[in-house]
Amino acid sequence: MAIMDFGGVKEEVVLRKEFPMSKARRVLKKETIAVIGYGVQGPGQSLNMKDNGFNVIVGQSKKYIKDWNRAKKDGWIPGKTLFDIEEACERATVIEMLVTDAAHQKIWPMIKKNLKPGDALFFSHGFSIVYKDQTKLIPPDDIDVIMVAPKGSGTSLRRNFLMGEGINSSFAVHQDATGRARERCIALGIAIGSGYLF
């Protein structure tokens, strides 16, 4: 892992060759990763993880039939790998919150009641956590809270993945309840198709 100086700001940069896919698979081998939301980031992240051999399921509200049908068209199978949001959360050890900020607030009570000690809550941006006094999204103390933020749309993430390339992503650990949050975070970053993480 390299430390790089960007205009006086030191950043740790993790390359795929330093944290290869085989290591990511070892770190996440016992995890069930639920991607919540099949809108902007959900398709790219979930399909990349699926293609990389991870145990991933999708949680999508049937009320948003366009997204539900898109998930089915992309090969997710209702009752097997495609569930309503609550059932996906019940089955998961890692919950990726890839819905909109407004939806974070709406579904948070359902997500929170399904979190188990040792689970990980994953975001692709930090608004809901940073402004928790406004969003009321306050995770329990016994879970990991992590972020991997691809520097591009879910479409770009998927396109680059299919071309054998990655997209740069930022990563952060907000809460480490298990002692494994950082390793899980980097592994998920590699799993979704990041070229390198910083």
Task: Describe the residue ranges of each PLM region.
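Residues at the starts of beta-strands that form the adenosine-phosphate
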Residues: 32, 54-57, 144
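Structural signal for hydrophobic packing residues in well-ordered secondary-structure cores
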Residues: 53, 103, 111, 115, ...
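Glycine-rich adenosine-cofactor-binding loop
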Residues: 31-49
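NAD(P)-binding Rossmann-fold cofactor-contacting core
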Residues: 44, 50-76
